[in-house]
Amino acid sequence: MALTFKDIERVANLARLELRPDETEHTLSQLNGFFALVEQMQAVNTDGVEPLAHPAALLGEVALRLREDIASEPNQREASQASAPAVERGLFLVPKVIE
């Protein structure tokens, strides 16, 4: 995937950014470099490769200090929402700020 100068101008316009032509060219170069790197990584065959929890796990002698993913606090939803001005189905309701 390669972006064009027009793509950068369009995204800058949507983001309400004013870029000089040299900034647009620099951004185009950086983003295309990023996409090229992503394409290289996607091309690597990872079939049969076991995912690692942490790169240090490869070393073997390093003990990982990763804790179990267990909730350490009780669900406080009702208590947190007790003082809210508006709640619906467990969610805070806020005024619409974007038209």
UniProtKB/Swiss-Prot annotation:
Pfam families: GatC (PF02686). InterPro entries: Asp/Glu-ADT_sf_sub_c, GatC. Its EC number is 6.3.5.-. The keyword Lipoprotein does not apply. Keywords: ATP-binding, Ligase, Nucleotide-binding, Protein biosynthesis. It catalyses: L-glutamyl-tRNA(Gln) + L-glutamine + ATP + H2O = L-glutaminyl-tRNA(Gln) + L-glutamate + ADP + phosphate + H(+); L-aspartyl-tRNA(Asn) + L-glutamine + ATP + H2O = L-asparaginyl-tRNA(Asn) + L-glutamate + ADP + phosphate + 2 H(+). It is an enzyme of class 6 (ligase). The keyword ATP-binding applies. SUPFAM superfamilies: Glu-tRNAGln amidotransferase C subunit (SSF141000). One of its GO terms (biological process) is translation. Allows the formation of correctly charged Asn-tRNA(Asn) or Gln-tRNA(Gln) through the transamidation of misacylated Asp-tRNA(Asn) or Glu-tRNA(Gln) in organisms which lack either or both of asparaginyl-tRNA or glutaminyl-tRNA synthetases. The reaction takes place in the presence of glutamine and ATP through an activated phospho-Asp-tRNA(Asn) or phospho-Glu-tRNA(Gln). This is Aspartyl/glutamyl-tRNA(Asn/Gln) amidotransferase subunit C.
